[in-house]
């Protein structure tokens, strides 16, 4: 299936000059959503995933159904203050400032093979922070899968050395 046909592009949103790639149109089409998640599941299986990690919120949209189908755990990666127990945290840079991501301190066991799933790869900052926490806990990032990759924003280069699958790619 050609997944790109199910993505709606919204010009000048959330701000002028941005062409937003809206995955909700793909999610609203049952067969397209299922086939895209199935493609990420196939990838995670080939990578030997013991657990799936996904950044909030749209990483949950692809990561949770993948973990469920594979009968393995899902690790939510959340913004600071959203997880109730002890966490590890990584501060990372945004275009205008900084943010913090966290995961529970016992979410990844040493030696576990983790596949990170998310909706979109742009600059790679969120995924880079996620990788740091996984590796800090002793996990191995076995692969990273995305619905969409925006070429030309440096994300793939920032994640050099990691196996990456993108179902849809947009040139800059």
UniProtKB/Swiss-Prot annotation:
Q: Does the keyword Cytoplasm apply?
A: yes
Pathway named in the protein's UniProt entry? Purine metabolism; AMP biosynthesis via salvage pathway; AMP from adenine: step 1/1
Q: Does the keyword Cytoplasm apply?
A: yes
CDD domains attached to this UniProt entry: PRTases_typeI
Subcellular localization, as worded in the UniProt entry: Cytoplasm
Keywords of the record: Cytoplasm, Glycosyltransferase, Purine salvage, Transferase
Q: A single GO BP annotation from the record?
A: adenine salvage
Tell me the Gene3D superfamilies matching this sequence.
3.40.50.2020
Which GO CC terms are listed, alphabetically? cytoplasm
Annotated Gene Ontology MF terms? Answer: adenine binding; adenine phosphoribosyltransferase activity; AMP binding
| Assembly and binders | Homodimer.
Its name, as the record gives it, is Adenine phosphoribosyltransferase
Originating species: Exiguobacterium sibiricum (strain DSM 17290 / CCUG 55495 / CIP 109462 / JCM 13490 / 255-15)
Q: Which gene encodes it?
A: apt
């Amino acid at each position: 299936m050609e997944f790109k046909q199910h993505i709606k592009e919204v010009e000048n949103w959330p701000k002028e000059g941005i062409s937003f790639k809206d995955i909700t149109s793909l999610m609203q089409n049952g067969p397209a959503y299922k086939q895209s998640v199935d493609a990420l599941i196939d990838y995670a299986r080939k990578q030997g995933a013991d657990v799936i990690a996904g950044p909030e919120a749209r990483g949950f949209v692809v990561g949770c159904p993948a973990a469920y189908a594979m009968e393995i755990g899902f690790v939510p990666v959340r913004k600071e203050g959203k997880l109730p127990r002890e966490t590890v945290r990584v501060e990372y840079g945004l275009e205008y400032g900084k943010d913090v991501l966290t995961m529970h301190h016992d979410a990844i066991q040493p030696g576990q093979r983790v596949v990170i799933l998310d909706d979109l790869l742009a600059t790679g900052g969120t995924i880079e922070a996620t990788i740091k926490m996984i590796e800090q806990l002793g996990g191995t990032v076995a692969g990273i899968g995305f619905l969409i990759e925006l070429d030309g924003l440096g994300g793939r280069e920032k994640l050099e050395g990691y196996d990456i699958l993108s179902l849809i790619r947009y040139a800059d």
